[in-house]
């Protein structure tokens, strides 16, 4: 992978602009990749969001295969992403195991697949919480399930611009999110509960939601897209 990435980096002098997906990511790229012949090429523009797909999925609904719809009388946490090291699922599962000792009427839904599937399953088995953690696999329509849950949690160690946070905001979920290096560009005023990515901090975030301390904010995806397009136009016109 490093060799492949090096080949890509070597092409950078050929391009007019090197556009990152957020200001924070641009700063990281500038710090790690900048050379004299490309230092004026760095810019950024947020990704746009296909909000209509989310709305269409919510309207269509879906049938669940292999698991039941979340019980509205319980606290239901949900996360979505590839089962890979940076997503930090094992720390999430361990924290949730501790959380269940205090709030047993809760469930955790993990949407996605990936190389750590067996390890995550093994951790769930070891903790004896198979009846409280649901691994859904990949879903064509994850948003209906998300809409039936209580809170979205993203405990990642690192991210670029996590689109899943925007999708969770469109669905209207309260959000607990870790402070990965580029998180600043994904935050909204009074729009999330920020934690570290350690097991102890994730447990703190889960408890915070149970205590009513995790906020929900209004999110306008159309306005967001207008701003993202404006950023892109500015990025390529410099």
Briefly describe each language-model feature range.
Residues 75-98, 115-121:
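A conserved mid-protein helix/loop that constitutes part of the nucleotide-sugar donor-binding site
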Residues 174-177:
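Short hydrophobic beta-strand element within catalytic cores of glycosyltransferases
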């Amino acid at each position: 992978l490093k060799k492949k990435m090096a080949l890509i980096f070597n092409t950078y002098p050929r391009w007019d602009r090197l556009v990152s997906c957020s200001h924070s990511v641009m700063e990281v790229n500038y710090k790690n990749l900048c050379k004299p012949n490309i230092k004026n090429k760095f810019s950024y523009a947020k990704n746009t969001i296909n909000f209509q797909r989310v709305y269409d999925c919510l309207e269509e609904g879906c049938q669940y295969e292999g698991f039941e719809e979340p019980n509205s009388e319980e606290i239901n946490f949900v996360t979505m992403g590839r089962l890979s090291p940076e997503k930090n699922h094992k720390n999430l599962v361990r924290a949730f195991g501790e959380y269940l000792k205090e709030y047993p009427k809760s469930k955790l839904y993990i949407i996605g697949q990936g190389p750590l599937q067996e390890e995550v399953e093994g951790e769930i088995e070891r903790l004896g919480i198979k009846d409280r953690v649901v691994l859904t696999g990949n879903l064509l329509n994850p948003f209906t399930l998300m809409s039936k849950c209580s809170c979205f949690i993203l405990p990642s160690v690192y991210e670029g611009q996590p689109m899943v946070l925007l999708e969770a905001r469109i669905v209207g979920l309260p959000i607990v999110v870790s402070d990965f290096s580029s998180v600043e560009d994904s935050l909204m005023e009074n729009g999330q509960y920020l934690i570290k990515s350690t097991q102890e901090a994730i447990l703190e975030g889960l408890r915070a939601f149970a205590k009513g301390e995790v906020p929900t904010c209004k999110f306008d995806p159309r306005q967001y897209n207008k701003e993202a397009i404006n950023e892109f136009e500015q990025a390529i016109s410099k």
